Amino acid sequence: MSINVVQINSGDLIGRRFNGYDLKPYLHSHDVNSTQLVYWNKQSDADFVSKAFDYPGNRYVTRGFMQFEQKLSMHARIQPHSWTLPYHQKMRKADLAHLHIIHDGWLSLSALPFMSRLKPTVWTWHDPWAMTGHCIYPIQCSRWQHGCGSCPDLNLPFSMRKDKTAEQFAWKKKVYAKTKAEIVVASEWMCDMVSKSPLAEGFNVTVIPFGLDLERYKPADKAAARDRLGVFAGRPVIFIRSSSTPFKGLSEFVKAIEQLDSDIRLCIISLQETGHFDRFMGKHQIIEFGWSNDENLLLDAYAACDFFAMPSMAEAFGLMAIEAMACARPVLSFEGTSLPGISFAPEAGVSVPHGDITALARAIELLVRNPADCEGRGKLSRTLAERHYDIRDQARLTADLYKRVLSRDKRSGSVA
């Protein structure tokens, strides 16, 4: 008997590798029919994707409530349309709802008890926001373990004007106490956070790592990729996502490049934002893609590089890390995030103390000056990706979870 599941998310094609979009055909092989409801970024014309809310002026209304929440120093609490979501046709037809990115302002978490009473619910925590008083990542702060309040940084996303983090934390606790949902996280690092969170008490938690199509993400000819991208001959190549988001560690990486020995001449390939490496032009070759959804370009970048730098100050999983591993490239990261575990440092990946710029520079030099070691780490990374990050395994584990949840919950698949 097949299972009908609706994936509820902020967007479809943006984040498709972790929001259930790419998982659909693999779930189908396990008798799971998956559809999607999205809000901010519906880009696909596929018939299995629909807008969560489509009434006239809904975005103006949503943004208006978000601005009101910002003035009151709260987030994801009001949005009255949230209580109508269970009556959407795709929700009514589904046996189970799987929540993904629902915390970027368009949905009220206050509706979760109502929604989960009407429909068996799985909720993937893609980041720690569900466990904090306001921030997506608490970085080095531990107040999320004790109810928040006296917040050390209200400017972290999602920012607050006044410190109402303790109030927001207490509100979440009340909501969660009335919510029946199975929580999914993608890394042991996140699972460890969940085990320490007062807000997660009472929830069952399952770890399901994200996966890739390993026939698509695989080792490729380095020389050919470098020719296509125009890499100067003889240059060690580093690939990095250049995001100025405070969690991504770009400024730390730039400072580490400044500390490299003067004889090192690199090629730095960057994806997303441009201009961050202008100061190095003339010494290092800089190849900037800007923002791109071109998967072939991404695969060329992985093939061309010697290693992938992901110096995030906070990271709940790191999908680009496993993409690099699948392409036989080791990952360089900071400790204190999920990445050393995801990249299997120190055997395959390389990690350095959290925020230590000098240690990051020395690690870059070590990888650059020891190409045989770098290549060996890359080969091991591919082996580990095959063992742990196959999208077929993700689909199997996800389908098994759906079946377990439904076997424990005999409610009807309809809210009518």
Pin down the residues of each PLM region.
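Short hydrophobic beta-strand element within catalytic cores of glycosyltransferases
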Residues: P330-S333
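Conserved acidic donor-binding segment of nucleotide-sugar-dependent glycosyltransferases
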Residues: A345-P346, V350-I357, L366-P371
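Aromatic "clamp/platform" in nucleotide-sugar-dependent glycosyltransferases that forms part
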Residues: M313
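A short, well-ordered alpha-helix in the C-terminal region of glycosyltransferases
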Residues: L366, D373-H388, Q394-D400, R404
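Nucleotide-activated donor-binding/catalytic signature segment of Leloir-type glycosyltransferases, i.e.
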Residues: G275-L299
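Short alpha-helical donor nucleotide-sugar binding micro-motif in glycosyltransferases
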Residues: D300-C305
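Acidic anion/phosphate-binding donor-loop and adjacent secondary structure
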Residues: S195, G211-R228, G234, D278-R279, ...
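Conserved donor-binding/catalytic core segment of Leloir-type glycosyltransferases
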Residues: V231-K248, V254-I257
